[in-house]
Amino acid sequence: MVRENIDAIKQRPTQYARLRYRLKNANVYVSKGGYHFTDYLDPVNEISPEIDTSQLTEQEASYIETQLQANSQRFLHQVQVLSHYLPLRNANVLDIGCGGGLLLSLLQREGAQVTGIELSDSRASYAASRHNLEIHKRPIESDFWQKGYAGYFDAVTLWDVIEHVNYPLQTLQAAANVLKTGGLLLIDTPCRDSFYHRVGEMTYRLSGGRFPTFLNAMYSSHLFGHKQIFSTGEMKELFGSCGLEVVQLQRFHELSFPYEFYLKKLLRSEILVKLFQPFVRAFFRLFKIRNKMLVVGRKSEHVVASDTS
């Protein structure tokens, strides 16, 4: 079982945790057990389930194509990981936070029956229109999924998603509930026991909070921003609390966006961003820092019921 209930802690951060990092875009609290999270929650209950197609502007489409889906090898690798554990032909797969739908499109080509959840109007519209996919703008915790699709899917995936949700334990329980017995839950997410987070902690401490470096790129109090970063141990405990047997947990190197995206979060000057880009590119070619983790869990017969109240 989880040593602490992170969802309960997040509802009362000042009572159950202490403020440790005051960042440019977020206040990061740390619980007694070590959970790191911001005090911001997305207004999910105010989001309409209808997809507003007018939000898919040319600028938004360009962002999806040149930034969000720029690393095509990343999506191909995700297909490879899933196919290692599950024959894709006719498999029912749900991707939570499916973005522009590229992964679902690739899975569909392999014969999978795919469905996506995306709460961003522009991304949901892009995935539905450009890839002709079934996309729903309803959170996994809603009755639509919990009552209509309980025990339905062979696999549920959350790629770079669990760090964005309001209540991660509730999200994982809800995802486990829509899995068949023996079904798979696959997650990748930034890892707190990594070089970047540790360096950020050190520079913040040594500078008295003036130079958080990587921490500024890892947490955000903006809509759908990073609300929590987990350690590998915490993620393993969360899976276990949801009745999921961890069959794979590994750290690996991956950048979800182009180098420029991260440099802009670290450096305020466009000139410095352009100056540092070639050095950063060379650095990552030499050193594959394991900044993320992949966790694969299999649903056992005894699963904790999802509490979506």
Predicted regions and their residues:
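Conserved N-terminal segment of class I S-adenosyl-L-methionine
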Residues: 1-159, 169-172, 251-254, 260-264, ...
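Surface-exposed loop/turn positions
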Residues: 91, 182-183
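A short linear boundary/processing microfeature
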Residues: 130-133, 181, 205
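A short His-aromatic
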Residues: 160, 164
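S-adenosyl-L-methionine-dependent methyltransferase catalytic module, highlighting the catalytic core
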Residues: 166-177, 184-303
